[in-house]
C-alpha cells in the first residue's frame, strides 16, 4: 500500500521510481505488481520508469494526481492495471515516451487530467534527443484497454518548438472508449499518420 502523498509542487516527488535518466537503456527487469496507490499526488509521475524491460501490472491507482510515466528506457510493459479518478483534478493514467513498449488490458475510469496528466498521453519527441530528454515513441503497441469517462486521450502530447517528432510505428487497437460527454474520442496534437487505429 502506498498513500497518501500530497502535492509537492516540483519534480522529485514520485511515489516510486525505477532507474535514473542515465540508466535509461539498462535492463532493470523490475516487476511492480499487486499494489494499491491511493492519492499518491506528489508530482505528475506517480510511478516513474527510467530504465528498460520492466513490468507494471495488476496495480490499482486510486485518485492519484499523476500518471505511470514510461519516461526513459525501452520495452516496458504496462498491463492489467486499474486507474480510478472519480473525477478528481489531474488524475491520470499512462504517459508514453521511448520505444518498444506494450500497454494492454488496463482499465481507466473517471480520470480528469489533461496533457501530461492525460488518461493516455503519447508524447512527441526531440529530434536527435539525448537519452535524458524526450526520445521518439516508436514500435509501441496499445491494445484491449478500456477508457470510461476519461477527460483526455492525447497523441502528440507536449508538442512545442523543441518536441517536434510525432510517434511512428505505433498501434492503438481493440480499445474501448466510452464517454458521452466528449465530441471526439481522442485529441491529436500532432500528425497521427504513424499510428495505426484499428478495431476500437
Task: Describe each region flagged by the PLM.
Residues 1-199:
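Glycine- and acidic/polar-rich repeat regions and solenoidal domains
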Amino acid at each position: 500500500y502506498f498513500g497518501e502523498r500530497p502535492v509537492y509542487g516540483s519534480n522529485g516527488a514520485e511515489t516510486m521510481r525505477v532507474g535514473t535518466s542515465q540508466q535509461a537503456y539498462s535492463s532493470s527487469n523490475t516487476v511492480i505488481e499487486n499494489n494499491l496507490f491511493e492519492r499518491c499526488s506528489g508530482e505528475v509521475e506517480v510511478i516513474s520508469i527510467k530504465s528498460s524491460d520492466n513490468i507494471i501490472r495488476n496495480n490499482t491507482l486510486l485518485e492519484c494526481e499523476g500518471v505511470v510515466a514510461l519516461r526513459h528506457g525501452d520495452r516496458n510493459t504496462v498491463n492489467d492495471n486499474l486507474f480510478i479518478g472519480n473525477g478528481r483534478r489531474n488524475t491520470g493514467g499512462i504517459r508514453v515516451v521511448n520505444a518498444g513498449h506494450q500497454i494492454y488490458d488496463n482499465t481507466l475510469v473517471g480520470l480528469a487530467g489533461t496533457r501530461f496528466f492525460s488518461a493516455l498521453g503519447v508524447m512527441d519527441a526531440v529530434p536527435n534527443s539525448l537519452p535524458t530528454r524526450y526520445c521518439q515513441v516508436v514500435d509501441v503497441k496499445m491494445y484491449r484497454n478500456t477508457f470510461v469517462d476519461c477527460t483526455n486521450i492525447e497523441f502528440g502530447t507536449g508538442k512545442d518548438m523543441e518536441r517536434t517528432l510525432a510517434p511512428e510505428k505505433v498501434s492503438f487497437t481493440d480499445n474501448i472508449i466510452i464517454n458521452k460527454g466528449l465530441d471526439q474520442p481522442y485529441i491529436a496534437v500532432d500528425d497521427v499518420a504513424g499510428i495505426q487505429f484499428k478495431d476500437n
